[in-house]
């Protein structure tokens, strides 16, 4: 029997990462924030003083990437996120990282992956898919508060503008644009607490887990 796979997609700061971590912990599944794979490649390039359009170097770093040593605290800087969004437009890099992500879902007993193309490209046959949304003002406020909690300066208007640009780039890129899978459950977290979003997701996941266990 194949491991159970939960795919979670959505735009930046929609709450998908927090939800994915909580779901993975609850069901004792493995979790992968696929955005960190692109951030890791971007970070490696920036550390070497290279630009994000250096495809040869980006491909080399993607090939060397070890999913077991991704460090969220090191990779959560805003500038790395912006660079990662550009890295994600390089077809050869996406191909390499998607292959690594697909290997990850083979690990039992199951996994939760969050990103922007999980349900559509990485795991089209996932047992259940979610597409997480929230209005852009709520998302900007969340990102603003996240940055402040890290003790860094934050500019709400700049964050709002950056999110709009990020959405445009993610949704219109040629390779794996951000969009909901046709069979994904839409979950709007604009007015939901993390506990409410988690409860809503579990209501849909639980019957599938129980059905799998009964086989």
Curated annotation (Swiss-Prot):
Per the UniProt entry, the Enzyme Commission number(s) are: 2.7.4.25
| Keywords on record | ATP-binding, Cytoplasm, Kinase, Nucleotide-binding, Transferase
Query: Could you give a GO molecular-function term held by this entry?
Result: CMP kinase activity
Per the annotation, which location comes first and is thus the protein's main one? cytoplasm
Cellular compartments per GO CC: cytoplasm
| GO annotation (BP), single | pyrimidine nucleotide metabolic process
Domain of life of the native organism: Bacteria
Localisation: Cytoplasm
Q: Name one Pfam family in it.
A: Cytidylate_kin
Would I find Cell division among this entry's keywords? no
- Family to which this protein belongs: Belongs to the cytidylate kinase family. Type 1 subfamily.
For this protein, the record's HAMAP family field holds: Cytidyl_kinase_type1
- What's the protein name? Cytidylate kinase
Q: Which organism is it from?
A: Bartonella bacilliformis (strain ATCC 35685 / KC583 / Herrer 020/F12,63)
Classification lineage: Bacteria, Pseudomonadati, Pseudomonadota, Alphaproteobacteria, Hyphomicrobiales
